[in-house]
């Protein structure tokens, strides 16, 4: 090949912009510029995942396959990825538990259920509402058909020996033969029964936090001089660029970790139920599910089995050892444990981790109507948007505390300026 031919081929592949395109993708996905020329082996695990995602996006591929691409991404990066994929001109196949992400990116939804694969036009929310409507219609049609069947059978039973009614009886027998009561195919999609019921209504004093500060062992400031009061009815989402900040805060207010400075106090009427990020210690045991759950609430074996049944553990499954459960099964056990507390304040550290979409939907729906207080962190945009009525962001220089919806928070220019200031961005 001649040099001119190589240059032509290089230009066709957009080679002159290769380095700047790569830098744009890396920066968009949250890899800082000073890490762009660092060896992969020197990056953290989360940074490596972002580089791999940038590699998949690079080169404008004809077909892009993404498996849970939003895992461990912060809100700015997820928003950037949503916008990038929404404007992507080629085919994208994506698997995700992030409903807002699916709604923002997808034009079609592939449903794998009833042993079949079906494609629907529309995003996730449109598919979900349509599928629920179709199911309700099927159930109504079946109920009407069963009622009609009972009416016909009752008429035939009463008048089969009545000569004067013989023609009517014969007519109804024919109608009964033609009546088809279609069985509704059982779905592989199961929704757990998640219901949090506070045993006691909370008073006006929920939680008071004064001057709370915490650093890591390496000296990294997670949050500093945090002051706020939680009011009755508050459902607070905690945000931070450093996920360890939220976890440390929750561990402190649950008495599992000491702050470097400051105090906190719970109201006398408050009972809490805590869902920690790391539940490993809860499952380092040989207990089966029934015995494990019995540690956390009152009730006999039959009651506990029924409770586990609502959380989608049935039959012999309830006798499995908890140590062999999957991540999603362990999360459902932890949620069951919380429900037994009948607490009026829930503390949830990234509660949708390991859960499937059905469990997330059930969890989300109950928290929207929950009558107590909620303090939580989450990567799930839809979960935050529909549950939280207050936002507190923990930064190294204090907090941002706003009574507003999440969508407004992440799009507000004022908040963007405030966040940059609080994090010391240049």
How would you label these PLM feature ranges?
Residues 8, 158-159, 192-195, 291:
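Short hinge/gating elements
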Residues 138-158, 165-174, 190, 413-426:
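ABC ATPase nucleotide-binding domains
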Residues 1-142, 199-426:
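ABC ATP-binding cassette signature C-motif
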Residues 37-38, 162-166:
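Short, surface-exposed loop/turn segments at secondary-structure junctions
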Residues 164-168, 178-188, 265:
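Proline-centered turn/helix-capping motifs that create local helix->coil transitions or kinks
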Residues 184-206:
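ABC-family P-loop ATPase nucleotide-binding domain
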Residues 23-29, 154-158, 174-179:
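Short amphipathic coiled-coil heptad-repeat segments
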């Amino acid at each position: 090949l001649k040099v001119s031919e190589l240059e032509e081929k290089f230009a066709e592949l957009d080679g002159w912009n290769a380095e700047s395109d790569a830098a744009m993708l890396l920066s968009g996905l949250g890899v800082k510029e000073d890490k762009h020329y660092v060896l992969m082996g020197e990056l953290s695990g989360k940074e490596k995942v972002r580089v791999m995602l940038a590699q998949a996006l690079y080169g404008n591929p004809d077909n892009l396959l993404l498996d849970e691409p939003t895992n461990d991404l912060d809100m700015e990066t997820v928003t950037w990825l949503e916008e990038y994929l929404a404007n992507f001109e080629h085919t994208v196949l994506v698997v995700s538990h992030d409903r807002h992400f699916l709604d923002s990116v997808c034009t079609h939804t592939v449903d794998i259920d009833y042993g079949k694969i079906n494609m629907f036009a529309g995003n996730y929310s449109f598919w979900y509402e349509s599928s629920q409507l179709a199911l309700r219609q099927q159930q109504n049609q079946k109920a009407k058909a069963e009622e009609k069947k009972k009416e016909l059978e009752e008429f035939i039973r009463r008048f089969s020996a009545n000569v004067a009614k013989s023609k009517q009886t014969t007519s109804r027998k024919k109608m009964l033969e033609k009546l088809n009561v279609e069985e509704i195919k059982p779905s592989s999609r199961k929704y757990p029964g998640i219901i949090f019921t506070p045993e006691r209504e909370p008073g006006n004093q929920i939680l008071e936090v004064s001057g709370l500060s915490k650093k890591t062992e390496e000296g990294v400031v997670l949050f500093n001089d945090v002051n706020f009061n939680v009011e009755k009815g508050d459902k607070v989402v905690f945000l931070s660029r450093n996920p360890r900040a939220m976890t440390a805060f929750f561990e402190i207010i649950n008495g599992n970790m000491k702050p470097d400075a400051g105090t906190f106090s719970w109201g006398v009427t408050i009972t809490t139920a805590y869902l920690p990020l790391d539940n490993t210690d809860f499952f380092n045991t040989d207990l089966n599910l029934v015995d494990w759950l019995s540690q956390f609430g009152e009730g006999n074996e039959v009651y506990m089995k029924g409770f586990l049944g609502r959380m989608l553990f049935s039959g012999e499954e309830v006798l499995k050892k908890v140590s062999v459960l999957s991540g999603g099964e362990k999360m459902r056990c932890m949620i069951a444990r919380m429900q037994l507390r009948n607490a009026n304040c829930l503390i949830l550290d990234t509660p949708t981790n390991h859960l499937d979409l059905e469990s997330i939907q059930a969890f989300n729906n109950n928290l929207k109507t929950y009558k107590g207080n909620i303090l939580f962190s989450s990567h799930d945009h839809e979960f935050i948007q529909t549950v939280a009525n207050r936002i507190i962001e923990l930064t190294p220089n204090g907090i941002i505390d706003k009574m507003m919806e999440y969508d407004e928070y992440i799009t507000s220019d004022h908040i963007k300026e405030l966040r940059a200031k609080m994090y010391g961005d240049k």
